[in-house]
Amino acid sequence: MKKQWIETINNAWENRTLLNEENTQNTIHQIIEEVDKGRLRVAETENGNWKVNDWVKKAIILYFPIQKMETIEVGPLEFHDKMKLKSNYKELGVRVVPHAIARYGAYL
């Protein structure tokens, strides 16, 4: 699957009209979910050296044009963004102080 994802992302990177295709959008969403859960990373160590997964970085950038802007209301606060906010900080074991924000796709 990873090989297919890389090919789909690299093709969409070179030809942005492919962002209109359902398969491309589904691939991007699957990659973002994997990054969100910490199973896939933009950069990782390999044999003691850091390696950048360019295709993951490209998928994150390509995520923005396929998302719609939406208003997100949290208590008295209002945001207007293309990415959902993360939730369930307690279950994630993460301390979040007032007005800290993490978006969906960020592994904590």
Positions of PLM-derived features:
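Terminal amphipathic alpha-helical/low-complexity segments used for targeting or macromolecular assembly
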Residues: M1-R95
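Structural signal for interior beta-strand "rungs" in well-ordered beta-sheet cores
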Residues: K90, V94-L108
